[in-house]
Amino acid sequence: MEIGAVVGAAPAENVRRERPGKGDVVVLIGGRTGRDGCGGATGSSKAHDEKSIEACGAEVQKGNPLTERKLQRLFRNKSFARMVKRCNDFGAGGVCVAIGELADSLDIDLDRVPKKYEGLDGTELAISESQERMAVVVAREDVDRAVTLAGEENLEATPVATV
C-alpha cells in the first residue's frame, strides 16, 4: 500500500532543458481526453451559488490516481526522462496551453488526440482539462522508444504534434 504526498524531484543528470528543434515530436502520454474540465480555468474564477452544481459539472476535472501513479513511475525511468527535451502537464487550457507552451511553432493534429468517447468537437479537444495527461517533446528518432516505455507502464502514448 502506498500513502503520502508526491514531491517532484529527479536527479539532475536525468533532466534535460533544451529548446525543441524543428522536426521534434510532441507525444501525449496518459489519460484520454473528454468533456470533463472544459472551461475549468474560467469556471474556477466565477462567482458560485447553490445552483452552480447544476451548470458547472463539466468544468470539474475527474482525476484518475492509478494513471497518475503510472505517469510518476514513467518519469522516474532514467531512460525515458533523458529523452524528454521539455514537458508540460495538462492544467488550465488543455491541449491549447499544455502543448502550445512547449515551443514557438507547432503543428497540432487534434484528430490524433486520444478520446474517452466519440462526439468531441475540435474546441472540446483543444480546451479539455482532463487530468493525468502529459505532453512531452522528444526527438523524432526517440518517438518509438518513448511510446514503448510508456506502454511498459500501461500508459497510452500518442504523437500529436510536430515542432
Predicted regions mapped to residue ranges:
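Glycine/proline-enriched, intrinsically flexible loops and inter-domain linkers
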Residues: 1-163
